[in-house]
């Protein structure tokens, strides 16, 4: 297990270094799959997946809006993420292989997924105050 974690840390550093040539601040919000075989991450406002062994990352979201905060479902088949697609930050799900995202929340505030429970329910925070666009720390938020 220790070797796998060291390998994972090395891959994240190499991946970050590769993307750092564009902008060191674009690679964000990574999440390791339940089986430890893949990493979902945000890069330039879209969600990507890469094997922990390395290789080419595959883009699973494509949208002019900013997609962020990827989380894996417990079975590893679905990615839960937040997106600013409808003028507020809502929660979506998409198959890990890619496909059409499905909107799960539609509140006027900003929702951020925090964890996905074994039964598939999502714990998220919701902010009724507008934070700075794409901010990481919403003001006035509550956990649901």
Q: Language-model segments: which ranges?
A:
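Short coil/turn segments that connect the beta-strands within blades of beta-propeller domains
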Residues: 35-37, 75-77, 119-121
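Short N-terminal segments immediately surrounding and downstream of signal-peptide cleavage
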Residues: 22-36
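Positively charged n-region of N-terminal signal peptides that target proteins for export
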Residues: 1-5
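Periplasmic/extracellular electron-transfer cofactor-ligation site
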Residues: 51
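A flexible loop/linker signature enriched in serine peptidases of the S9 family
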Residues: 21-24, 42-48, 56, 61-67, ...
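Cleavable N-terminal signal peptides
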Residues: 7-8, 18
